[in-house]
């Protein structure tokens, strides 16, 4: 594809560089530049991409898009200065890959909690109707029957990776792509998902998270609501299957109205809930250690649901998936039959069984809202102890740390605070901030609140304290494959570490 064909989405012909080379890729990392690439240089949090323009040129970049006026006239290949190169990256990538989102129905799922499970369940429910789906989520990527681990530690990849995956999905015959849409990716500052051509937007819930990035809770909500605004991005009469837009929201969330209001007027609006009046509703919910039972009523019929998923919050996740699939024409009975076969999502209320007399669950919960939901569900499931092992990420929202400690302190008999990606922060200081929250609600440091930075030792300590019938929760890491110390990811597998610790106690042999 020629440079001018890509740039026409950013500027008028009069402002195009005079030379129009063939472009072989759109790249933002100079280390990934290959001959013929268009290099996009922008200012990041830790580094300034403009400093790597010389390296990109040495590696064969054929053109450069940049934002710093200091580089005017200094780039010896065709170059274009834009107000914000990071924002420009997504439309450039979408153009280069031929706007693949326009060839499929695109489903976006956003919210503080539940995105990963909802995305996975939505893919399963759509496939129950015979569709081939692609998926982008925190845990896995999927194209048709091929699934592989997302090792990037990004729930929503950078724009070129998003568009490349969409291209691969379209070429593999997928009729749907289901994308986990984070607030960072949706924000106007990063704009990673522009050009994806969304058709269905799903909202799960919103609580406090990522205030270090968004600044305020209100801005955080507005950034998430951009997914619903993006339903208006592409509506071409030449593609009739893309003209129907659907907004799906959790009516139990007090902020759901702002998400409905953000959708274009022409979009269909569907709600789901457990407590509030809604189009799709679960009633008579029963939760046990083994799964969920509930009655679901919908505009497409009513039925009894029996899921193998643990935790009441998965009722909302399942309702969201059912709403999307049924709205797209999949019969309710087929959706439920498919969802009933799902054993769970890796790192999401994942049960670790080795014959031990207590329950061990691995979950990605790492926000105050997720803690509140999780502990309220787990506490009634045992008359014994609830023991929680968790930490809080370094260089992220500090305000949530004491809240995590406070919530865990209220619901758990024993709180064990440990490392979770301290990065360049003082690991002891992070742990102390969390422990202060637990101490504020009556936990005693060294007795009912233990501070053990070594996560492997923290897990073993929890198991040593556990008695028959207790529940041990290993929170925050979930599916992730590393713990970041400084800038170095150290390999880590929470479920595998739990199994090793149980084996040391004589279980699982």
Curated annotation (Swiss-Prot):
**Localization:** Cytoplasm
What would be one Pfam family of this protein?
Mur_ligase_C
The entry lists its GO molecular-function terms as: acid-amino acid ligase activity; ATP binding; magnesium ion binding
Which amino acids does the record list as binding ATP?
111-117
Instruction: Mention any one GO cellular component term assigned to this protein in its UniProt record.
Output: cytoplasm
Q: Positions modified as N6-carboxylysine? A: 224
Pathway per its UniProt entry is: Cell wall biogenesis; peptidoglycan biosynthesis
Q: Mostly located where?
A: cytoplasm
* UniProt keyword Ligase, yes or no: yes
Instruction: Tell me its family.
Output: Belongs to the MurCDEF family. MurE subfamily.
Q: What does this protein do?
A: Catalyzes the addition of an amino acid to the nucleotide precursor UDP-N-acetylmuramoyl-L-alanyl-D-glutamate (UMAG) in the biosynthesis of bacterial cell-wall peptidoglycan.
This protein is called what?
UDP-N-acetylmuramyl-tripeptide synthetase
Q: Which organism is it from?
A: Roseiflexus sp. (strain RS-1)
């Amino acid at each position: 594809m020629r440079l001018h064909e890509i740039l026409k989405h950013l500027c008028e012909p009069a402002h195009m560089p005079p030379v129009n080379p063939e472009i072989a890729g759109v790249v933002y990392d100079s280390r990934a530049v290959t001959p013929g690439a268009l290099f996009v240089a922008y200012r990041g949090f830790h580094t300034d991409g403009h400093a790597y323009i010389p390296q990109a040129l040495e590696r064969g970049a054929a053109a450069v898009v940049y934002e710093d006026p200091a580089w005017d006239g200094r780039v010896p290949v065709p170059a274009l200065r834009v107000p914000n190169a990071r924002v420009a990256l997504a439309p450039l990538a979408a153009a280069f890959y031929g706007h693949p989102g326009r060839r499929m129905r695109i489903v976006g799922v956003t919210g503080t909690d539940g995105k990963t499970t909802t995305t996975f369940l939505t893919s399963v429910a759509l496939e129950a109707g015979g569709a081939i789906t692609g998926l982008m989520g925190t845990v896995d990527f999927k194209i048709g029957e091929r699934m592989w681990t997302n090792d990037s530690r990004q729930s929503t990849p950078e724009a070129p990776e998003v568009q490349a995956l969409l291209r691969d999905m379209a070429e593999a015959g997928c009729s749907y792509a289901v994308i986990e849409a984070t607030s960072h990716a949706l924000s106007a500052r990063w704009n990673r998902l522009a050009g994806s051509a969304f058709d269905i937007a799903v909202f799960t819930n919103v609580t406090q998270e990522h205030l270090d990035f968004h600044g305020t809770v209100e801005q955080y909500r507005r950034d998430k609501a951009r997914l619903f605004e993006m339903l208006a991005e592409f509506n071409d009469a030449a593609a009739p299957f893309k003209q129907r837009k659907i907004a799906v929201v959790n009516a139990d969330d007090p902020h759901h109205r702002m998400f409905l209001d953000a959708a274009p007027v022409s979009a269909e609006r569907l709600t789901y809930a457990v407590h509030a009046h809604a189009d799709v509703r679960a009633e008579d919910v029963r939760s046990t250690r083994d799964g969920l039972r509930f009655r679901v009523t919908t505009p497409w019929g009513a039925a009894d649901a029996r899921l193998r998923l643990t935790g009441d919050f998965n009722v909302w996740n399942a309702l969201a998936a059912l709403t999307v699939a049924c709205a797209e024409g999949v019969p309710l009975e087929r959706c439920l039959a498919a969802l009933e076969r799902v054993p769970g999502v890796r790192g999401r209320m994942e049960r670790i069984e080795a014959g031990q007399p207590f329950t061990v669950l691995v979950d990605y919960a790492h926000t105050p809202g997720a803690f509140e939901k999780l502990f309220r569900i787990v506490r009634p499931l045992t008359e014994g102890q609830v023991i929680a092992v968790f930490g809080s990420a370094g260089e992220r929202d500090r305000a949530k740390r004491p809240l995590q400690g406070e919530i865990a302190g209220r619901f758990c008999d024993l709180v064990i605070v440990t490392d979770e990606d301290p990065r360049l922060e003082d690991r002891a200081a992070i742990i102390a901030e969390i422990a202060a929250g637990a101490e504020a609600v009556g936990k005693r440091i060294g007795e009912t609140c233990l501070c053990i930075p070594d996560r492997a030792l923290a897990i073993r300590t929890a198991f040593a304290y556990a008695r028959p019938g207790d529940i041990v929760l290993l929170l925050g890491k979930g599916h992730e494959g590393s713990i970041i110390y400084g800038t170095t990811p150290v390999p880590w597998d929470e479920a595998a570490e739990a199994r090793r610790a149980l084996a040391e106690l004589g279980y699982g042999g």
